[in-house]
């Protein structure tokens, strides 16, 4: 039976100052703007592409980098972010493209600042166009960065976010991250059990190379403290799902699992039937999703969770790669707090 803690173990969260959230949000927006240009080039989005189009994009890339320095954001951007913006157009490395996973963190920060009205379900993304519109920042224009950040710099500026609402959204992020990590462990439990049996032999022989399952756990940011739970996941997931539903952390269950709303494609022959069918959704259990969809939800959960963790200073520095060091933001994950 999974461990359950009382709500007395909760802590009162205090957000970082609004200007810190605004500065971090601005850094994310500049690099995500560059990410959009690089991703389009990588995917070969050409159309009626001309030499003038390439020149225009090169100028846009250079303008984004200048905006970072002229607005003073270079003092708040990470070294990795500055390095990405300084690279010439179409010279990004493979790992740079993973920055696209930060859209959801960008959305959470804007929600905390009151620029987004709600956080979408954890199987849906924030609307990216609305996120850019929410700040009013034109990535190549440093003055728009200042216009967004300056109102939050005043000493009397405070977030008006209700503390109970903040607590709820943190709890929701923890629940979905726990479920995403549980799915990774569920898929690897046999490999992990075998590795556990072989560990004494490896220690005796001095052989300690990373196994394929260990590589997956590392790249998918699974904390070491959770890995020993893999054997019990088939029994633990239904218990966690019921807990999450009863506490309002998920909207519904399907098959004793977190319910994922999936849109059904219509096969109607007439316009009325097709239109009606196109808007139909159904719930499926999380475990029944294919691996690509499960991975997409894991990335959404990780990104949002880390944004909350940083915003309440659970994470001291902005480095999403360290999310594997965090099991929860609360002292005990919200899934297991009564």
Predicted regions and their residues:
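Extended, charge-rich alpha-helical interface modules
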Residues: 2-338
């Amino acid at each position: 039976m999974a461990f359950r803690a009382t709500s007395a173990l909760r802590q009162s969260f205090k957000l970082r100052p609004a200007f810190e959230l605004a500065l971090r949000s601005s850094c994310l927006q500049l690099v995500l703007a560059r990410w959009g240009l690089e991703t389009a080039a990588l995917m070969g989005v050409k159309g009626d592409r001309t030499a003038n189009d390439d020149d225009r994009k090169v100028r846009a890339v250079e303008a984004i980098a200048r905006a970072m320095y002229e607005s003073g954001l270079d003092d708040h951007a990470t070294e990795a972010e500055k390095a990405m913006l300084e690279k010439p157009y179409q010279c990004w490395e493979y790992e740079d493209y993973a920055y696209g996973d930060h859209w959801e963190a960008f959305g959470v920060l804007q929600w905390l600042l009151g620029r987004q009205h709600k956080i979408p379900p954890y199987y849906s993304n924030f609307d990216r166009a609305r996120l850019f519109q929410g700040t009013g920042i034109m990535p190549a224009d440093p003055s728009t960065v200042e216009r967004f950040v300056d109102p939050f710099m005043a000493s009397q500026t405070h977030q008006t976010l209700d503390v109970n609402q903040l607590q709820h959204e943190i709890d929701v992020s923890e629940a979905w991250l726990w479920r995403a990590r549980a799915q990774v462990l569920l898929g690897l439990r046999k490999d992990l059990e075998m590795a556990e049996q072989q560990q004494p032999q490896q220690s005796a022989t001095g052989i300690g190379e990373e196994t394929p399952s260990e590589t997956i756990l590392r790249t998918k940011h699974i904390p070491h403290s959770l890995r020993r739970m893999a054997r019990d996941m088939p029994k633990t997931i239904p218990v966690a799902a019921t807990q999450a539903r009863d506490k309002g952390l998920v909207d519904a269950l399907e098959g004793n699992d977190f319910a994922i709303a999936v849109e059904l494609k219509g096969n109607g022959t007439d316009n009325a039937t097709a239109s009606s069918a196109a808007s139909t959704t159904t719930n499926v259990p999380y475990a029944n999703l294919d691996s690509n969809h499960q991975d997409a939800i894991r990335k959404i959960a990780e990104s949002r969770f880390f944004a909350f963790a940083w915003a309440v200073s659970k994470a001291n520095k902005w480095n999403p790669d360290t999310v594997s060091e965090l099991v929860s933001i609360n002292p005990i994950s919200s899934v297991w707090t009564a």
